[in-house]
Every structure is written in C-alpha cells, then in structure tokens.
C-alpha cells in the first residue's frame, strides 16, 4: 500500500489522488547512469518530482526502482513514500507501471503516472492536471499535449487502474489509452513543463541551451 505523503491531500481533499513515479529504467543512452539522480540546482530530478507531487496535494506515492536501485533509493530516504523494487525492470516500463499501480491503496479516486526525468515539472503543473481531471466529464483519463506532442504525467481514474491490473504484463496505460481514445481527454497546453524530459547527453545540452540552467551529475556519477 502506498505511503501517505505528510501534509498531502489538503488541496484536493475531495479527491483521493495517488501517484506512481517511474524511476527504474536502464538509461542506456546515458551510459547506464541513473537519470533520476541528475541534478538541477543541486536537487536530484527524482526529488524535484516528489516535491511537485507533494506540493500538489497528492495523497500517496509509490516510487518504482530497478536499475541501480540502491543508489536511487538513497535520494528518497526522507520522503514518506512506498519504495517498490521491480525485479523485471529490464522488460520495460510497463512492468514497472504494473508494480507501482499495484502498490497503491484501493481507496484512491485517481492515479497519476509520472516520470522521474522531467526537470521542469512543479506543483502548479500537477495541480492543473488534477483540475482538468476533476472537469473531465465522461472521460476516464487526462493526457497533456504540448503543441500536439503527448506529455507527462497522465492521470487515470480507478476503473482504468483495475483494467490495467487485470491485463498481462504487456498491457499498460499506453495500450489502454490507445484502445479507448473516446475515454481520453486531451489537455492541450503550451506549457513545456509537461514535455521536457532528459533521455540522453544531447538532451542535457539542449536543456542548458534552451533554459540556461545546467543539469549536473552528482560527483560520484560525473565523468
């Protein structure tokens, strides 16, 4: 069961919101260095994303680890979250998503699926996503789109969670969204916080060029 974030829930007490933060990837394009530990302003990206979720009033978070899990977990020791170690992380993101969703409590009305490599995401962005979900009408999911490009995080209702968990390990949120486009609400926005992530050294250089803020590895991972 996902741990309750201290102080969480106040902004959205009428809607119980949980989150899965995916941080298990192999980061092959980064030479195996774990992207969640890349730092902006001296703060690891995984911590920045947890701060954003907590600041938005998310009630509980499950963080899924895999590649170099021991190192990444050290960045989380003072956060009241559930740590989920996915032994099958090499099979891809869907297995990690399954593991994280299964770790959250059944009482939730909505689940955010977030990535740990988005340097710009903040609490206001998550609040806007939750706000769009509350106004979704008959839709079961809200997905941000930035200039026509799909972004992250996304937010799903409890029924989608159950559908995903009922499927096999190769059936995840992306497959559900593709199979049920009529139940997906697009949140069209010009806010690039939802679309900027860091997958490669070139992305790091591009981020510095566009935003003027360096992304740095901690000393033990610097080359």
Residue ranges and their predicted role:
Residues 2-16, 162, 168-223:
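Conserved alpha/beta core of the MobA/IspD/sugar-nucleotide pyrophosphorylase nucleotidyltransferase superfamily
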Residues 8, 12-66:
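N-terminal glycine-rich phosphate-binding loop and ensuing alpha1 helix
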Residues 33, 57, 77-80, 180:
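Short, structured coil segments at secondary-structure junctions
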Residues 48, 52, 71, 95-99, ...:
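Alpha-helical elements of Rossmann-like donor-binding domains used by nucleotide-donor carbohydrate transfer enzymes
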Residues 67-68, 88, 92, 124, ...:
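Short beta->alpha linker loops
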Residues 71-110, 170, 174:
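Short phosphate-binding loop-to-helix
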Residues 90-165:
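Conserved beta-loop-beta/alpha segment of the NTase-like Rossmann-fold superfamily
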């Amino acid at each position: 069961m996902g741990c309750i974030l201290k102080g969480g829930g106040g902004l959205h007490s009428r809607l119980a919101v949980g989150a899965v933060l995916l941080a298990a990837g192999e980061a092959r394009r980064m030479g195996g260095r774990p992207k969640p530990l890349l730092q902006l302003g001296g703060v690891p990206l995984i911590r920045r994303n947890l701060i954003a979720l907590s600041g938005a009033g998310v009630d509980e978070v499950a963080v899924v680890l895999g590649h170099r899990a021991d190192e990444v977990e050290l960045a989380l020791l003072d956060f009241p979250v559930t740590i989920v170690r996915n032994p099958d992380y090499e099979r891809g993101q869907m297995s990690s998503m399954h593991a994280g969703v299964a770790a959250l409590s059944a009482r939730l009305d909505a689940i955010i699926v977030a990535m740990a490599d988005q340097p710009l995401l903040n609490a206001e962005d998550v609040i806007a996503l939750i706000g769009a979900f509350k106004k979704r009408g008959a839709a079961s999911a809200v997905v941000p789109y930035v200039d026509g490009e799909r972004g992250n995080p996304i937010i799903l209702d409890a029924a989608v969670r159950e559908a995903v968990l009922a499927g096999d390990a190769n059936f995840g949120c992306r497959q559900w969204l593709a199979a049920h486009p009529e139940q997906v609400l697009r949140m069209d926005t010009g806010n690039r916080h939802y679309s900027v992530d860091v997958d490669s050294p070139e992305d790091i250089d591009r981020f510095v060029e566009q935003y003027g803020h360096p992304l740095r590895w901690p000393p033990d991972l610097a080359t």
